[in-house]
Amino acid sequence: MRGTPKTHLLAFSLLCLLSKVRTQLCPTPCTCPWPPPRCPLGVPLVLDGCGCCRVCARRLGEPCDQLHVCDASQGLVCQPGAGPGGRGALCLLAEDDSSCEVNGRLYREGETFQPHCSIRCRCEDGGFTCVPLCSEDVRLPSWDCPHPRRVEVLGKCCPEWVCGQGGGLGTQPLPAQGPQFSGLVSSLPPGVPCPEWSTAWGPCSTTCGLGMATRVSNQNRFCRLETQRRLCLSRPCPPSRGRSPQNSAF
């Protein structure tokens, strides 16, 4: 059916209005500020929705529009109607995205990351698995080291054992692997049984988001007590409006 002249006029007016709105949002030629904006750590500079100027990509939970685009490298898309009261748009994860969110940052499927220098994690199927990088063994007092203690070493991630003498005077580092005869427990000979002894895993260190749980166990090649740690997730932290979610597990 052919439209009437009145219908044609209405359609033409609508096109003119849309063109005017886009012209206001996307000026021609491009007029961009110099120097470009400085983005927070981990936030990339991207072209705006007009393909004109470089802007800081919007992060998870932040408002977005045609000009202020979401960080596509983190699997974020601009979802209309996701703002307060169903108004506006927010940067959210795509429904089919299998990335992981840790401490307010997103990681892709298969990507490895370290939320702390003592832990290495891998993103898998929307979750993550982690392994500790520091030994958590327990040094028992011995004849040649009656007061072993673990200390933080400047410039190193993992604490180290030292043998304190005289209230901290004359401390000497203990070797990473004990010698054949030094008072330290060596690994068990083959065939010697080691009765398993472990405490229950303690509560998660955080009420929401990524945390740490600990226990004491002798399940190691030395058959001696050590403090073991593993990551825990009590429940996801609720996203904060206008800001990237934060986590204080580390």
From Swiss-Prot:
Expression sites (tissue/organ): Expressed in primary osteoblasts, fibroblasts, ovary, testes, and heart.
Molecular function GO terms recorded: heparin binding; integrin binding
Protein name: CCN family member 5
PANTHER family recorded: CCN FAMILY MEMBER 5 (PTHR11348:SF22), CONNECTIVE TISSUE GROWTH FACTOR-RELATED (PTHR11348)
Taxonomic lineage: Eukaryota, Metazoa, Chordata, Craniata, Vertebrata
Pfam families: IGFBP (PF00219), TSP1_CCN (PF19035), VWC (PF00093)
Signal peptide bounds: 1-23
Subcellular location: Secreted
Function: May play an important role in modulating bone turnover. Promotes the adhesion of osteoblast cells and inhibits the binding of fibrinogen to integrin receptors. In addition, inhibits osteocalcin production.
Disulphide bond pairs: 26-50, 30-52, 32-53, 39-56, 64-78, 70-100
Domain VWFC: 98-164
Keywords of this entry: Cell adhesion, Disulfide bond, Secreted, Signal
Designated gene of the protein: CCN5
InterPro entries reported in the protein's UniProt record: CCN, Growth_fac_rcpt_cys_sf, IGFBP-like, Insulin_GF-bd_Cys-rich_CS, TSP1_CCN, TSP1_rpt, TSP1_rpt_sf, VWF_dom
SMART domains documented for this protein: IB (SM00121), TSP1 (SM00209), VWC (SM00214)
GO biological-process terms attached to the record: cell adhesion; cell-cell signaling; positive regulation of cell differentiation; signal transduction
Family, as annotated: Belongs to the CCN family.
Predominant location category: secreted
Domain spans labelled IGFBP N-terminal: 24-103
GO cellular component, one term: extracellular matrix
Secreted among keywords: yes
Domain TSP type-1 span(s) in chain numbering: 194-238
Record flagged with keyword Transport: no
